[in-house]
């Protein structure tokens, strides 16, 4: 309603794993009531077919990180800032590019850059950025495009789902409630024994993790079918 200031969603539920469906319908609804839209795309970038244009998110704030699927390690994050957003940062630093000579609607008492750099903070360790450059070069050299990685991930999820269904385990014990078509980059099984199963599998050299009653399997492009099975 018109009391809503912002809508914050994730492109993928990080606990149970399904994609957020109809993500492309949110921006018009937010614009209708004057609310800002923020999307956490961390679990979509570099593992799914995800683009601002496809999901109608050019006017939304969209953030993601370099760890996990981007393979950049910790310390890298990035955000798409819609053009023309001149909000004043609450937490800032000299990387916010403030300049008293800028002719900006937000120029008093301190003027910030007119572009997305106004949301930069204070001094930070820039080494992860250099690491990210080498990672991106590696991806290009090996022709590891987003489309290729997304296709590999989808096929791996299909394999995991097929192997699980073949076990024919009672749904009262463990179940797969999300079809592969609607999964994010990982498969999550719902079970009251998530923690104990995760620990027992780790003892056998199978690395998974769990969130509450969800046991999560995250395939990677460097794993072959035999390893997944």
Identify the meaning behind each predicted range.
Residues 1-46, 69:
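Active-site phosphate-binding strand-loop segment of PLP-dependent enzymes
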Residues 6, 36-38, 61, 186, ...:
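Structural preference for beta-strand elements that scaffold enzyme active sites
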Residues 38-40, 63, 88, 175, ...:
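Structural detector of well-ordered beta-strand residues that form the stable sheet scaffold
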Residues 56-108:
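Active-site PLP attachment segment
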Residues 111-162:
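Structural signature of PLP-dependent enzymes
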Residues 150-204:
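Conserved PLP-binding catalytic core of the aspartate aminotransferase-like
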Residues 195-229:
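PLP-dependent enzyme catalytic core of the Aspartate aminotransferase-like
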């Amino acid at each position: 309603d018109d009391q809503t200031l912002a809508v914050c969603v994730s492109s993928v539920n990080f606990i149970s794993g399904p994609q957020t469906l109809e993500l492309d319908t949110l921006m018009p609804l937010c614009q209708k009531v004057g609310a800002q839209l923020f999307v956490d795309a961390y679990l979509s970038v570099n593992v799914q077919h995800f683009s601002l244009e496809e999901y109608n998110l050019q006017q939304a704030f969209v953030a993601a990180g370099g760890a996990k699927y981007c393979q950049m390690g910790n310390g890298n994050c990035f955000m798409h800032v819609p053009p023309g957003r001149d909000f004043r940062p609450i937490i800032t630093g000299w990387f916010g590019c403030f300049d008293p000579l800028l002719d900006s609607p937000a120029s008093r008492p301190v003027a910030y850059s007119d572009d997305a750099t106004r949301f930069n903070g204070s001094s930070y360790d820039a080494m992860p950025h250099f690491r990210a450059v080498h990672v991106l070069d590696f991806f290009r050299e090996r022709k590891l495009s987003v489309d290729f990685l997304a296709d590999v991930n989808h096929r791996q999820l299909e394999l995991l789902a097929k192997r699980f269904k073949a076990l024919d385990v009672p749904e009262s014990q463990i179940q797969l409630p999300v079809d592969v078509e609607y999964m994010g980059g990982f498969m999550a099984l719902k079970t009251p024994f998530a923690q104990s199963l995760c620990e027992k599998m780790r003892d056998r050299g199978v690395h998974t993790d769990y969130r509450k009653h969800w046991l999560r399997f995250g395939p990677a492009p460097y794993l072959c079918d035999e390893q997944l099975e």
